[in-house]
Curated annotation (Swiss-Prot):
Residues 721-1135 are cytoplasmic. Residues 769-800, 869-889, 942-1003, 1023-1046 are annotated as: Disordered. One of its GO terms (molecular function) is calcium ion binding. This is Protocadherin-18. It is a single-pass type I membrane protein. InterPro entries: Cadherin-like_dom, Cadherin-like_sf, Cadherin_CS, Cadherin_N, Protocadherin/Cadherin-CA. Residues 28-137, 138-246, 247-354, 361-465, 466-576, 582-688 form the Cadherin domain. Its main location: membrane. Residues 28-699 are extracellular. Glycans are attached at N103, N269, N420, N559, N583, N641. The lineage of its organism: Eukaryota, Metazoa, Chordata, Craniata, Vertebrata. The chain crosses the membrane at residues 700-720. It comes from Homo sapiens. Residues 869-878, 1028-1039 have a biased composition (Basic and acidic residues). PROSITE patterns: CADHERIN_1 (PS00232), CADHERIN_2 (PS50268).
Amino acid sequence: MHQMNAKMHFRFVFALLIVSFNHDVLGKNLKYRIYEEQRVGSVIARLSEDVADVLLKLPNPSTVRFRAMQRGNSPLLVVNEDNGEISIGATIDREQLCQKNLNCSIEFDVITLPTEHLQLFHIEVEVLDINDNSPQFSRSLIPIEISESAAVGTRIPLDSAFDPDVGENSLHTYSLSANDFFNIEVRTRTDGAKYAELIVVRELDRELKSSYELQLTASDMGVPQRSGSSILKISISDSNDNSPAFEQQSYIIQLLENSPVGTLLLDLNATDPDEGANGKIVYSFSSHVSPKIMETFKIDSERGHLTLFKQVDYEITKSYEIDVQAQDLGPNSIPAHCKIIIKVVDVNDNKPEININLMSPGKEEISYIFEGDPIDTFVALVRVQDKDSGLNGEIVCKLHGHGHFKLQKTYENNYLILTNATLDREKRSEYSLTVIAEDRGTPSLSTVKHFTVQINDINDNPPHFQRSRYEFVISENNSPGAYITTVTATDPDLGENGQVTYTILESFILGSSITTYVTIDPSNGAIYALRIFDHEEVSQITFVVEARDGGSPKQLVSNTTVVLTIIDENDNVPVVIGPALRNNTAEITIPKGAESGFHVTRIRAIDRDSGVNAELSCAIVAGNEENIFIIDPRSCDIHTNVSMDSVPYTEWELSVIIQDKGNPQLHTKVLLKCMIFEYAESVTSTAMTSVSQASLDVSMIIIISLGAICAVLLVIMVLFATRCNREKKDTRSYNCRVAESTYQHHPKRPSRQIHKGDITLVPTINGTLPIRSHHRSSPSSSPTLERGQMGSRQSHNSHQSLNSLVTISSNHVPENFSLELTHATPAVEQVSQLLSMLHQGQYQPRPSFRGNKYSRSYRYALQDMDKFSLKDSGRGDSEAGDSDYDLGRDSPIDRLLGEGFSDLFLTDGRIPAAMRLCTEECRVLGHSDQCWMPPLPSPSSDYRSNMFIPGEEFPTQPQQQHPHQSLEDDAQPADSGEKKKSFSTFGKDSPNDEDTGDTSTSSLLSEMSSVFQRLLPPSLDTYSECSEVDRSNSLERRKGPLPAKTVGYPQGVAAWAASTHFQNPTTNCGPPLGTHSSVQPSSKWLPAMEEIPENYEEDDFDNVLNHLNDGKHELMDASELVAEINKLLQDVRQS
C-alpha cells in the first residue's frame, strides 16, 4: 500500500523534444507527463532550462520572458513569465477532463517576449490515470427470474459495473459467489466495456429451491485493486411451455451520424407459438442497459421498432451496444434476449473550428501591437480543428485583410499571424483581419472569424514647429505682461507622447537672463513680455523655444528660434553735446574783426533713437531778427552773415532749436550767448573758454590725456633721433684748411666711377621754384668768425640776386618747353645752363607782351636747394654754392666769362635756326612745339656730354635708397657728326647759319639790363675766409628727398658740368684760379634784387622796373651789365 501511494504522489515528468523544421519562429515541441490529482503548485518543467539551446541564439537571452497561450478558460497549468516554469494551477481530474478516453492531455503554446525575436514552443502535458475509482453497479440488488424449465447453458445478461478509470485501473473482471447452479462469463463490448452473463449450469427445480441470492463482484487491476459488488436475486418460476424467440441473436446496424431523430434503426420481430396472453410479446431494453443508451434510443414495446431518440455524434461515440429482450404476457414468462450493435458512420457534418489566441487579455477579438516593431512581430496564434475524420477533418486556413500581415503554419493545425512590414500608427492605427478555415469534405464546410489589430503608440515623433525661425515685431515702451505672439508645435503621438510643453532655453542679453525679458505659457506656447522694451537698449531679442513631449521612457524635443525686433518710437529728445552747456546755455565768443561767413560754432547733438527719429535739424528761432547769423539746418554750423565790424551790438542771445523728424517731433532748445571780444581780451576769453570746457565729460578728458601722452612720446623720439644724428655727424664735419693741408699727404684717389643712379635731375615744367632767404649761423671758436659772418651775409645777398636772375630768365621759357632745371642745381650752374641753351638755340625766350600772359609762379629758394643736396660724402668734398664747397675746382662760368660772354647780347636781328618755324600767330597765341623743338645734333654716347651729375656721391635718404651702379670709366663718346659748341664759341655761328638774335632775346636782355643798370655797386673790403661748416645747418640742408628720376641736360651744359665736377681740389681756400678775383662784386644789385617778389610773374617784374624807375636809379650800359654779372657769378662761386 505504501508503494502505491508513493507512486500516486510521484511526479513523473519527461520531455519529448522535437526540433522544428518549419520556421525559425517555431522553436520546439515539448511533451510532459504527469499524474492526475497532483498537488496544486507542483512544478512540471522549467522552460529556461529545457530550451536553453534555443535561447542562446537570441540577442539577449537573459532578458527573454515567456507567456502561455492557454486554450480555454480553465488554467489548469500556469507558466511563470520570468523563467518559464510550468506548474499545476488547479487539481486535475483525469476522469473529469477526458472521461473514458485513453489519451488525455493538456496542450498549450508558449511564446517568448519581446516579440521582435519571437520563439514559439508547443507544450503537451499528458495526464496519467491513477486508480482512484472503484467499479460500481447501478443497482445494489439485481432481480432475475428464470423458468424452472430453462435449459442448461441458458445465458442471461447481467447489469454492468462502471469504472471511470482507464487502463488497468478500469473494470477488469467479474466474479460470482460460489454455487452449483449458476456461473458467469465476462464478455467485452465493441466499445471495450466489459459485462457479465449469467449461465445456467444445472437444471433447475422450483420444488427443490425457488430462489437464489448470489453476490456479483466487479474488480479492476489497479494498484491498489478496487472492486464493487451487487446482489443477484434469482427467482425460479413455474414452467411456461413456450418462450418468445428472436430471429437473430444479434444485429449490427450502420448509423450515419447526421441521421435525424426518429430514424427507424431496426424492426424487431420475436415469435411465440402460444396463444392468448402467453403468445403476446412485449419488447424492452434489458435491465442492465446504461442510461446513456436509454437516452439515445427508443424501442416500441409492442411492435419492437428501435428508433433514434437523440442524434448521435461520431466524434463522441463511435458505436453503441444495446441489449433488447422480448417477453410474453403469460405467467412465469421467460424473456428472450437479443444484442444490437449500432456503428455510427462519420459524415462531414462539422465545420472547422477556429480558435484565435491573442496576447490581449480580456478581449478575444482585439490584438495589440506597438508601432515600429520589426517584421515578423507576433500578432496572434490561430488553432483550427475539425471533429470530422478523414478528408472531412483536413483543414485549409487562410488570412484575408492587409498585406502588412501574414499567416505562417507551425505544426498540425496551428498557425501564427505575424507582421509583414513595419507599422506606423500615425499612418494607420487599426487593421481588420479575417481568418478562413475550410475542410476538404464534400461538400466543403468553412468557418470565418474576424478580429482587429490595433497599433499601440510609441513616442517616435518629436514635436514639430511649422518654421525653424519665427520673426515678430513689437513696439518699444510696451506694457509689462503684454502678449507678443504664439508659437505652436504639433506632435502626432497619442496621450502623453503627444502632450507638448514649451520652455525658453536659458540665454543672456546684456548680462540679464532671457527669462527676465519674455516668458512663455508652457501649455499653449503663448509668449508674453515681462518688461518694458527699449529700442535704444536692445533693438532685437533672439531666444530659443523648446517644445518637449511627455513621452516615456525618453522625452523628445525640438527647438525653434524666435526673433523679436523692437520697433523704435520717437521717445528720446535730442541731447546737445557741444558746445558745453550750463543751465542749457552756452557762451560763444566772436572776434571783433570777423568777416561775413566766419564760423561761429557748431551745435553737436545726438538722438538715441534710430532712423528718421534720429535725423536732426537745427534752426534759430529767436535772437536773430536782423539775420546777423545763419545756421546750416543739417550740420548745425552757425556762421556770421555780416561783418562784425558793421554790427553795433556786442552781445546776442540766440535761441536754437534742435528737433528730430519723428512723429511726433521732439526737440531741444539751447541758448547761445554770443559776445564780441577784442584781440586784447583774447586771454580773458580763452580763460572763460577754458572754464566752460571744464564741464567736458570724462570721455573727452581721457581722449585729451591720451593725446598729450602721445605728443610727449613723439617729442622725446624726435629729440632722441636728432641727438643721435648730431653725434653721427661729428665725425663727418669738414674743414677746408684741415682738408687741404692733409690732402697732399694722402695718395691720389682713383677717379670715381659714375653710376646711373647718381645722375638725378628733376625737370621743372612751368613749375614754381620757391625763393626764400636762408640764414645760416654757426658758432665757431675760430678767430675768423666775424669775417665769416660778413661773408655769409654777402653771400646771401649775392645768392638772392642770382636767383632773381634765374627767375627772370625762367619766366621767358615757353609753357610747352620742358626746362631742365632742378632744385639741386646751384644758381650759378642754372644761369650757365640758361645761357648755354639760349646760345645753342634749344629754347627761345617767350615774347614779353601783354596779350599772351600766363599765370605762372616760379619759386626758387637757395635754402631749399640744400634739401636736395647730394653733398657730404664723408670725404670732405662738397657741392658748389655751399659754404664748404671746394674752391679749387674749375668752374665753367670762368670759361663762359673768358670766352666771350658778351656775345650773348649781340642783338642784330638775326633769327636762329630754331625759330624758323615761328609765325605771327606765335606772338598772339604763343609758340607751338614746332617752334621750340628744332632739329638737334645727334646725342653723344658719352654720358658726360649729355648728363649733369650734381655730386660724386648720393647720400642715403630715409625714404629712398639708390644703390650704386657702376658705369664703365672708359666709355668712349660717339661721334656726333657735329662740332661741339662750348662757351668759347658761344654766339659765334658760321657764316652760313642764320642770325641768332631775335626780338625775344632782345626783350630778355633788355629787361636784365634795365634791372642791373639801376643798381649801384657797393664796396666790400675783403673776402671772408672759408669757415667750418655748421653741422646743424648741414643737417637741415639734407632734409629734402632726392628726386627719383634722372633727366639728361642739353649737350653743351652737360659737357662743362661733367668736366668741372670731377676735378680734384688742388688749391687752398682762396679764389679759384682763372677767376677775376680783383673785381669786387657790386652790391648795388642786392637791394634791387631783394625787391623782386618770390612769386615772380611778368606783371610783377614790370612793377619792379617801374618802381626802380621811380627811384631814379642810374642806368647801366650792356658792357657794365656784363661786368656786373661776372662779379655776381664770382661772388657766388667763391661763397
